[in-house]
Amino acid sequence: MADFDNLFDAAIARADETIRGYMGTSATITSGEQSGAVIRGVFDDPENISYAGQGVRVEGSSPSLFVRTDEVRQLRRGDTLTIGEENFWVDRVSPDDGGSCHLWLGRGVPPAVNRRR
């Protein structure tokens, strides 16, 4: 685990590790520089979303995977991964936040215009 400037950030990072350990699932990276690697993260699939109330901001309705940033540093847009029996592609990787980040995913294979060369 990284060194932190304050106790709060260190506590949050420990909590994130615990959450991934208990609630996480395995994902296998199937293309790109990390092809074959297995990472662990908390998968969120908000496919059944109701309308938000007044004053509520919704970040997005795409599936995401909450992971350790160090485990996905070489992952790029268009790389693919499998969670369970379903295939996904990386739409974007959120900035590092205390050693963790979100992978925002698309279902299936990436559109041809987004594929890595």
UniProtKB/Swiss-Prot annotation:
Give the InterPro entries listed for this entry: Phage_Head-Tail_Connect_sf, Phage_tail_attach_FII
| Localization in the cell | Virion; Host cytoplasm
Pfam families assigned to the protein according to its UniProt record, in alphabetical order: Phage_attach
Q: Just give the chief location class.
A: virion
Which UniProt keywords are listed? Answer: Host cytoplasm, Late protein, Viral capsid assembly, Viral release from host cell, Virion
GO BP: virion assembly
GO terms for cellular component: host cell cytoplasm; virion component
Report whether NADP shows up as a keyword of the record.
Answer: no
The keyword Secreted belongs to this UniProt entry's keyword annotation: no
The subunit structure is: May bind head-to-tail joining protein W and protein U.
What is known about what this protein does?
Answer: Plays a role in virion assembly by joining the head and the tail at the last step of morphogenesis. Six FII proteins probably bind protein W that closes the DNA-filled capsid, as well as the U tail terminator protein of the pre-assembled tail.
Task: Quote the protein name from its UniProt record.
Answer: Head-tail connector protein FII
